[in-house]
Amino acid sequence: MSSSSTSIMDNLFQRSLEDLIKGFRLQLLGESNFISRAVEEIRREIKATDLSTKSTALHKLSYLAALHGVDMSWAAFHAVEVVSSSRFQHKRIGYQAITQSFNDQTSVMLLITNQVRKDLNSANEYEVSLALECLSRIGTHDLARDLTPEVFTLLGSSKSFVKKKAIGVVLRVFEKYHDAVKVCFKRLVENLETSDPQILSAVVGVFCELATKDPQSCLPLAPEFYKVLVDSRNNWVLIKVLKIFAKLALIEPRLGKKVAEPICEHMRRTVAKSLVFECVRTVVSSLSDNEAAVKLAVAKIREFLVEDDPNLKYLGLNALSIVAPKHLWAVLENKEVVVKAMSDEDPNVKLEALHLLMAMVNEDNVSEISRILMNYALKSDPLFCNEIIFSVLSACSRNAYEIIVDFDWYLSLLGEMARIPHCQRGEDIEHQLIDIGMRVRDARPQLVRVSWALLIDPALLGNLFLHPILSAAAWVSGEYVEFSKNPYETVEALLQPRTDLLPPSIKAIYIHSAFKVLVFCLGSYFSSQEPTSSSLAQESSSGSLLVNVFTHESILSLVNVIELGLGPLSGYHDVEVQERAKNVLGYISVIKQEIAEQLNLQDNETEASRVTAFMEDVFSEEFGPISATAQEKVCVPDGLELKENLGDLEEICGEHLKPVESDSVSYTDKISFSVSKLRIRDQQEATSSSSPPHEASSLLAEHRKRHGMYYLTSQKEDQDSNGTSSDYPLANELANEISQDSFNPKRKPNQSKPRPVVVKLDDGDESRITPQAKTNIQTANDDESLSRAIQSALLVKNKGKEKDRYEGNPNSGQQEKEESSRIENHQNSEKKKKKKKKKKGEGSSKHKSRRQNEVASASEQVIIPDFLL
C-alpha cells in the first residue's frame, strides 16, 4: 500500500515535458546547471514502478537528448519496460526512445525482439506502424532474421497504411539479412502493379535505392518500371522511376532508346518544374547520345536559366554542368546568361556559374575568361574571390599547363592575382611560380621580371596570406638571376628594411637568394677579367647580358650593400636566419679584401676567384619537377633491414639510455660540457695528428662495424650561424612604374608566339590518390552480397514467369518459343554439367557452401527483357 501511494504521489507532483520546457526558458541557473538538475530528477523518476511516471521521465529524457545531446544510453532497459505497456501513449514514447538511442552495440537489443514481433502482429495498425518504424531505424542482423516472416505477411496486408510502411522497412531488412530477399522479393515486385499511389510510391522508392547500389540487379525489372513510367500520373513516382532509368540506361544502351520518347513526352506536357528537371537530368546524364532528347533538354534548361527564382536558376546551371562534358555547345549557347549569373546575389548560383565558365576554358578563350573572372574577383566578397582565383589556377595548370600558349601573359596574370586585395591563395600561386620556372625555360626571363615586381611591392609584405608568394619570388630571383636586368636592384629588394615583417623561414630564403645574386655577380666579374675567355663568357648564357657590365666600383658597392644589410642579422633570434646571414658574411670576408685592394684578378689562383668558382659550381645544378610518387619508386637496397622494434638500442647505446638522476646536472650543462669536450678533443687531434690513435678510436671503429646500419655517412659541414633586420633604404622609385607594366590586366597573350617546351613527367603530374576507398570496402562487400541475392531471386522469378507465359498462351510467336527453349536447354545443360562435377568431387568435398551456390546462380546470364529487342 505504501509503494502504491508513493507512486501516486510521484505521479501527482511530477513535472511534465511542458513544465520542463517552460522551466528551461525561465531558468536563471545557466543551461548546463539546469540540464544537470533535470537529468538527476529524471534518474529518480524513471526508477518508479508506475509506467506513467516512468514514461513521462523517459519522454523528458528523449527531449533533452534530441535538443541538447544528453546521453540516454543508460535508460535502455527502462525504454524496453515502457514499450511493453499496453497503453499506446506509453508504447509510442518507448519506441521513440529506442529509435533514438539504440544501436548495434546496445546490450538489451535482444530483449525487444518478442515485443516487436507482438506489435507487428497486433490488430491495431498504429501499433504495427510504431514497430515497423522502429525496425527500419535500429534493425540488426538478428532482428531482421527473426522478424522476416512478419514483414513478409505485412507486405500482403489489406491496410494501405501498414503495407506502405512494411515496404519501406524491407530495404533495411534486405541490407541486414540478405536471405530475406528470397522470402520477400517476389511480393515486393508484385506491388509494382498496384493501383494505390501511396503503395506504388513506396515500392518504387525501395527499388530506387536498390538501383543506386547495384543497377545490374534491377535490370530484369525494366518492363515493370517502363509501365510505371508510361501509365503513372504521380509526379513523385515518376521522379523516382526516372532516377532508376538514369542508372539502368548506363549499363544497357538499348534501354535508353526505348525510354527516350516517354521522357520527352513528360517534358513537353508537364508544368511541374521538379519533374521537368528530373527529365532533363536523366537525358543529359544517361541519354546524351540521343540528339533530339538532348536538344529538348537544353531548351528546357534555357527556361530555367531565365527564371527569376534563384532555385530554378541554380538547377538550370547544375543541369548545364552535367551536359557540358559531352555537349559543350549547350554551354556556349548560354554563355551570356552564365556570365550574368556571376553577379547574382545567391552564392550557390555564382559558384555554379563559375564552374560552368571553367568548363568552357580552352587555349583560345583562356585569356578572355580569365579577364572576366579577375574583374569579378576584384568586386566579390573574400570567399567567392578566392574561389575564383583557385578555379583559374586549377584550370590553367591542368595537365602541365596544356591550355597556356603565352607563358609571359600567364605569369603576368599570376602577379595580378597576388595584388587582388582579398587574395588568400598564396600557397597555390607560390607553387605555380616555382613550377613554371622549373618546367618552362623560355618563361624564366618574364618570371624574373614578375618576381622582382612582387618583391618591391610594399603592400604584399603586410599580408600574411601572400608571404608564400614572396617566398617564391625571392627564390626565383636568386635561382634565375642570370635573367635579371639589374642584379643590384634585386639585392636592394631582397634586403629592404620592410622584410622584417616576414616570418624567419621566408627571411632565410631572402638571404640565400641574395647570396646567389652575389655569387653570380662576382663570377661574372671574374670572368670578364680574363682576356682569353671574356668573349666566350659573354656568349655562354643566352639569358644574361650582364657579363661585361660589372666594374670594380659596382662590385664593391654591391658587396658593401649586402654586408650592411646582413650585418645586423648575425645576431638574429632565429637560428636559420642567423646561420644564412653568417654564411654570406663569411664569404664576403674572404673575397672583400682582395677586391678592395684591386689585386690582379686575372690570376685564377686568388682566394676570391677560387671560392667564387666553387660556389658557382654549388649553385649550377638546375632543379626540375619531381613526381608526387617518386618516393614510392625508390627501391630498398639489398641487405638493408629496418627493424620495426628498435629493442636492441639498449645493447648499442648501453648506459646512455639510463634515466637521468634528479640530482644530476641539467640538460643544458651536459650539452655545454659535451661540446667543450669535443672542441678540446679536436684541438688535441689537430696538434698531435702524428701520435698513435687513442684506445677509444679503436672501440668506436669496432662499434661502427658492428652497428653500421644505425650510423649516418661521415661528412663534415663546417658552417657558421647568425642573423637580424636591416635598415637599408627601399628600392628605387622606378619600381611602381615597372610593376604596373608587369601587372597590366588588359594585356593579351601573344598568340603568334610558338608555345614553349613544358617539361612533363613520364608517369604524369597528378598527385597521389588518397586511400579513402579503403573505408568503403565493407560496405561494398555487403552491397555485393545483396546484389547476388536479388539476382538469384530475379532468376527464379523470370524462370517461373517465362514458363507460365508460354504454357498459358499457345498463340505466342514462334521466335519467343525458340528463345524460351534455347534458354531452357542452356539451363538444363548447365545443370547436367554441375551434376557431373558434383559426382566427381564427392570424394574431396561433398557439400558446397551456401555462398558458393549464390555466386553460381548470380553468375548465370541475366535475361534481357523482350521489350528492348
Swiss-Prot record:
Residues 831-850 have a biased composition (Basic residues). The modification N-acetylserine is found at residue 2. HEAT repeats lie at residues 33-70, 107-142, 143-179, 180-216, 218-254, 292-329, 330-366. Keywords: Acetylation, Cytoplasm, Golgi apparatus, Membrane, Protein transport, Repeat, Transport. Residues 815-830 have a biased composition (Basic and acidic residues). One of its GO terms (cellular component) is Golgi membrane. One of its GO terms (biological process) is endosome organization. Disruption phenotype: No obvious phenotype except defective lytic vacuoles with altered morphology and accumulation of proteins. Residues 769-780 have a biased composition (Polar residues). It is found in: Cytoplasm; Golgi apparatus membrane. Residues 738-869 are annotated as: Disordered. It is a peripheral membrane protein. Adaptor protein complex 3 (AP-3) is a heterotetramer composed of two large adaptins (delta-type subunit and beta-type subunit), a medium adaptin (mu-type subunit) and a small adaptin (sigma-type subunit). Binds to EPSIN2. Part of the AP-3 complex, an adaptor-related complex which seems to be clathrin-associated. The complex is associated with the Golgi region as well as more peripheral structures. It facilitates the budding of vesicles from the Golgi membrane and may be directly involved in trafficking to the vacuole. It also function in maintaining the identity of lytic vacuoles and in regulating the transition between storage and lytic vacuoles. Belongs to the adaptor complexes large subunit family. This is AP-3 complex subunit delta. It comes from Arabidopsis thaliana. The lineage of its organism: Eukaryota, Viridiplantae, Streptophyta, Embryophyta, Tracheophyta. The gene is DELTA-ADR.
